Amino acid sequence: MTEPNRARKTRQRTAFAAPDQRTAPRRGALALRPLVFAVAGVWTAASAAQSQGATQQAASAQAPSSAASVTALAVSGPTTPGGAPLVPKMAEPVKRPDNAVPSFAAADAMDGRTNEDIHLRGHGELRRNGTVVKGDTLDYNQDTDFATATGNVRLFRDGTLVTGPDAALKVTANEGTMHTPSYEFHTVGGRGSAERIDFIDKDNSRITKGTYTTCSPDNVDWYFSASQIDIDSDRQVGSGRAGVLHFLGMPVFASPVFDFPLNDERRSGFLAPVFGYSSRSGADVTLPYYFNIAPNRDLTLYPRLLSQRGLQLGAEYRYLSQTYNGVLRGEFLPNDREADRNRWSIALVHNQRLATGLNAYVNYNKVSDSTYPDDLGRSIVTATQRQYTQEGGVTYSIGDWVALARVQKFQTLSTATTALSPPYERVPQLNLSYNRYDVGGFDINFQTDYTKFSIPTENTVQGERLFMQPTISYPIIRPGWFVTPKFILNTTSYRLDRPTGDTQASQINRTLPTVSLDSGLTFERDTPLVSKWFGRSYIQTLEPRLFYVYTPFRDQSQIPLFDTAQSDYNLGQIFTENPYTGYDRIADNNKLTAGVTTRFIESETGIERLRATLAQRLDFEGQRVTLAGSAPTSVRRYSDLLGATTIQMFRGIFFDTNLQYNQDIDRIMRSTMAFSWKPDANKVINLGYRYYRADANTGQLALEQTDISAQWPLTRRLYGLGRIGYDMDAKKPSDMLLGFEYVADCWVGRLAVQRYSNATSGYTTHIFAQIEFKGLSKVGNNPIDVIRLNVPGYQPVTAQPVTPSVLDQYE
């Protein structure tokens, strides 16, 4: 609020103590310059140009005998020739209880009776105990602490400003009434108006026929109205009756009773409804109810109505303590009208600290049938899940030792069009590892693992496996080069239960040593030409690397594959000792891998702007160990050539490519490319390409796909986003997403449609629609997680409120 002109001749300021702090008066004097004086605990600062009546009143004023009963005003006054003030600076007041807190008054003109009341005329202002009352006229009774104000009344307390034509209240007790008020909550940026507001006490108030919005006054796109709203500042909660949400001039939601928090603390009550649509289930409406059981426990019930299937009941219970935490979630759909059976799911994640270094955990997930995620999943993430883990275990760590004991099972979902074989279950697995670095320059590692494997498939080998692997290496790292010799001993013992008719050995022992030598050099140079092109100083590196590994051949064709698969062939795998995961296959090796990397690094920041790598492996003898156990159909001396490049030379531009090239057949076996341009916030364009050539040796299926995704502003407030993935082999889209976001100063609207192929050789379509009312709630089905998954670099737009002035909250 603009402060009235301080040069007004009648502008007066007064500070007076509480009635019970009055002291005996004494005579005072009047100075030509502004001075401070008091009458029975009342100080007044007046200018020399005061009216004659005001001057006479000031001349007869008296000062208190004790400075402790008053509060000083910062007023400039006359000084002696030596610079000492004629009016001495008053001591800092001692803290008083609320009933003894001083009051401050200011107005163009004031009058009143000593120790009884004061009348303010023209820009009246009263301050007491954190409350500010302003009005054209203001009357205040010191004995009753009662104030009445009329004309442009402003009441400010604890970050809340209430304005209206009149007000009557007890200032300290915050008891009173204001008619046709408007209010602003500066801490949350909300505002509204009402027919009446009653201040019940310091913590409670009641709003009659009130509204609330976070929109600017000249653009109220939405507001919430209610016949009655009760505010409890102590509990930081509000409640009301007959609430209606209006959006763009239309009522869109109503509730007979409601409650809401005044801060970020959790409160029990209904959450915003979630709306959606799925081609497999129809219209989808969820109305969650939240129970704030305790600060460390809560429960959410979420009944979900599916128009084509029925009513699904769901619940999620969360708990947390110093020694444990977890989440229990369950869903139940009785008598699904489409499937004609009950559908359900359950999930439990629990973590427990039993003692120092000793922890336990449970991760259990199960669904009623194989099509549950397709029919009832809310997004492509859940709809494509085909394996559910059911696991529990204990871990213990002390020093360099780590132990694990667990039982791990799986639920595998197979459909008529997607037949999946279940993996082996670990019932149980016991694992012990030891890691110690720099023991006289040596790094020591020891792994031992015992697992009993079981599988719910008939006529399939099962059994037990004991694996031990000590490793010792001696890294020699110097500026510009490194050499790391390593020795590994792989020892494995099997005891197998083979199906009837299988005559292979039931007990197998295997011991294989492995030696490797890893080495590399690093050269650096300045690049004045590149630095000139890009306007920055760059350093280029050249980093050649050689890696040799030797493992003798051992026939492993009789060993089953419990948990072993071919590692993905890439620049990380080509510099390792074994191309297989798990412990069931140890490849015979007599191989040398050569690679070279060059990097461009900004000299000042150390940011890597470009990296390019080439690598290839030379096989001196030809690997004979395969996953199938049979000898390979052909032996290759040279592996596929691997290349990779990452470039981010320009602001917001990123390019990455990987290539796998087979020299023997002169064919590209694998190629991936990714391009991203992100010039600014909420602006991104992504291009992607993936090509995999069919390979019988690795089981790789042919694949060729491309995709494009983007988020881009179409207007100042409207943003478009989308993605399309195209299968070039099938000549049809594999997945699509199209969406829009509209951002206003107090709300954001989001609409997205997603379509993807499902496990039954069809397509599933989801529609997401959400409106986010700033400072109130979100209504609809949140598409943000789905968009983030489909559009890399996506940033949700947020409401753009009018930037407040630094003086907006000044009273």
Swiss-Prot record:
InterPro entries: LipoPS_assembly_LptD, LptD, LptD_C. One of its GO terms (cellular component) is transporter complex. Residues 1-17 form the signal peptide. Residues 1-22 are annotated as: Disordered. GO terms for biological process: Gram-negative-bacterium-type cell outer membrane assembly; lipopolysaccharide transport. The keyword Electron transport does not apply. It comes from the Bacteria. Keywords: Cell outer membrane, Membrane, Signal. Pfam families: LptD. Disulfide bonds: none annotated. Its main location: membrane. The keyword Signal applies. It is found in: Cell outer membrane. Component of the lipopolysaccharide transport and assembly complex. Interacts with LptE and LptA. Belongs to the LptD family. Together with LptE, is involved in the assembly of lipopolysaccharide (LPS) at the surface of the outer membrane. PANTHER family: LPS-ASSEMBLY PROTEIN, LPS-ASSEMBLY PROTEIN LPTD. This is LPS-assembly protein LptD. It comes from Ralstonia nicotianae (strain ATCC BAA-1114 / GMI1000). The lineage of its organism: Bacteria, Pseudomonadati, Pseudomonadota, Betaproteobacteria, Burkholderiales. The gene is lptD.
